[in-house]
């Protein structure tokens, strides 16, 4: 199955999309990667969903990516007498280490790390920013605040600290357990929630040890400030606009989205734009015009993928949401302005032989209007380099590793085919031509460009480029 677009679609699975039949329908509608949110999914259910995805993969003979989204260290209040209280603007409110139920003057804050790092003047946001507090005094077991925006506080509501870097791991005990379970069933991507620093990525990579790629969810101001360092260590980025819009002013989120999309492309790392992209389609079969524009803007900016959350997980129209996103992407990419924007954003290649080869492949393919750029890749690095250049020609990645194909499912423009490794350079070119014809990317009489690393099978050794003419024999296999 060949997609008629370059941007990829990530669809979240949930109650509305947890059957094998629905997963197959979502894939047919356009989903390239399936996300499993471990905040709402048990390990047993996660294993079942991965099994269903792999069944669809076998039935369609197409690599499908599986993304596990870890819950992360969510900060929460304790409980309240009666379950809820009202706090008024201007009142004093205390957060302390006493586990007794709270009232209109105080509440239990169970994370001791907060008390030693928060400072006067810092902000606390409760229940996604509905209640805002400013710190007046900070003591080892007690924080005195002033209520800036009052409202209702109830049991175990979430707490956000946009000004405070908290000295704890991005992997809670639940996350470590979920990650190990996910690695055992062969997931492809793991998304880390609420990261603050590059060390959070390094910690996760010590656990994954190459068994899964690591995606950094940028949803805290602290992570935005250290974006360059995080990009260096992460394998991909997610613009997690939900919590990001809680912890920083909403009007700043679009600029951060553009900054991340641009930085990811320069680094050759995939970028996924997420949260509320087609939110109204939870209850409506058609999106709002603003939502269509939001998805289109992300694609115009050059995002590798756009993501559906509740729309596909818990909405009434999951298949329609995926199909709508698919149509928007196809329409945007057919616009002449899209190609102009993509070309204008192209950065100079890194000063390496592999990056020079990828840049040359793009220039040759564009100049000669070649049918496809075909990459032989073991680790996926060759395909990533070519995708960074955003050629007009389709990118076909050939890999002997199914795990590589699955990880590349989130990368802009890459259509991956799993095939045995080439025996020599002649076999490499001949098989590339046959597969390009078989997958409907080329016809006899057209030309393709083949990019690879020699010796064959050496990860990251992109050093060969060859223009190949497709003969009539290529259509016979």
Question: What is the meaning of each model-derived region?
Answer:
Residues 1-477:
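Non-catalytic helical/linker scaffolds that mediate oligomerization, partner binding
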């Amino acid at each position: 199955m060949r997609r008629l677009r370059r941007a990829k679609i990530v669809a979240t699975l949930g109650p509305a999309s947890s059957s094998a039949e629905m997963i197959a329908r979502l894939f047919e509608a356009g989903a390239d990667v399936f996300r499993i949110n471990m905040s709402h999914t048990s390990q047993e259910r996660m294993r079942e969903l991965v099994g269903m995805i792999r069944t669809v993969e076998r039935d369609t003979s197409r690599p499908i990516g599986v993304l596990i989204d870890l819950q992360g260290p969510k900060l929460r209040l304790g409980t309240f007498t009666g379950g809820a209280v009202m706090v008024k603007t201007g009142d004093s409110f205390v957060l302390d280490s006493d586990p007794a139920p709270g009232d209109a003057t105080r509440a239990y804050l169970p994370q001791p790390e907060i008390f030693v790092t928060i400072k006067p003047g810092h902000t606390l946001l409760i229940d996604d920013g509905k209640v805002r507090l400013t710190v007046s005094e900070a003591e080892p077991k007690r924080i005195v605040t002033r209520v800036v925006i009052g409202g209702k506080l109830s049991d175990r509501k979430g707490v956000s600290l946009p000004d405070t870097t908290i000295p704890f791991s991005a992997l809670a005990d639940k996350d470590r357990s979920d990650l190990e379970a996910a690695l055992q069933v062969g997931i492809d991507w793991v998304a880390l929630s609420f990261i603050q620093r590059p060390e959070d990525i390094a910690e996760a990579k010590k656990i994954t040890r190459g068994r899964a790629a690591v995606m950094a969810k940028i949803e805290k101001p602290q992570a935005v400030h250290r974006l360059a360092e995080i990009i260096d260590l992460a394998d991909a980025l997610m613009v997690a606009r939900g919590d990001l819009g809680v912890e920083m002013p909403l009007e700043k989120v679009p600029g951060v989205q553009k900054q991340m999309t641009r930085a990811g492309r320069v680094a050759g790392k995939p970028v996924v734009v997420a949260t509320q992209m087609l939110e109204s389609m939870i209850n409506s079969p058609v999106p709002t015009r603003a939502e269509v524009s939001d998805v289109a803007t992300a694609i115009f900016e050059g995002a590798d993928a756009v993501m559906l959350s509740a729309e596909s997980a818990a909405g009434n129209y999951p298949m329609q949401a995926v199909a709508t996103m698919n149509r928007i992407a196809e329409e945007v990419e057919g616009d002449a302005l899209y190609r102009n924007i993509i070309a204008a954003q192209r950065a100079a290649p890194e000063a390496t032989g592999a990056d020079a080869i990828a840049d040359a492949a793009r220039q040759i393919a564009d100049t000669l209007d070649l049918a496809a750029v075909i990459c032989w890749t073991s680790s996926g690095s060759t395909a990533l380099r070519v995708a960074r250049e955003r050629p007009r020609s389709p990118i076909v990645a050939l890999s002997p590793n199914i795990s590589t194909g699955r990880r590349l499912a989130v990368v802009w423009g890459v259509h991956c085919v799993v095939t045995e490794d080439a025996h020599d350079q002649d076999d490499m070119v001949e098989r590339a031509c046959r597969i390009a014809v078989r997958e409907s990317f080329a016809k006899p009489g057209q030309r393709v460009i083949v990019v690879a690393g020699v010796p064959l099978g050496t990860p990251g050794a992109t050093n060969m480029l060859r223009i190949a003419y497709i003969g009539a024999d290529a259509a016979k296999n």
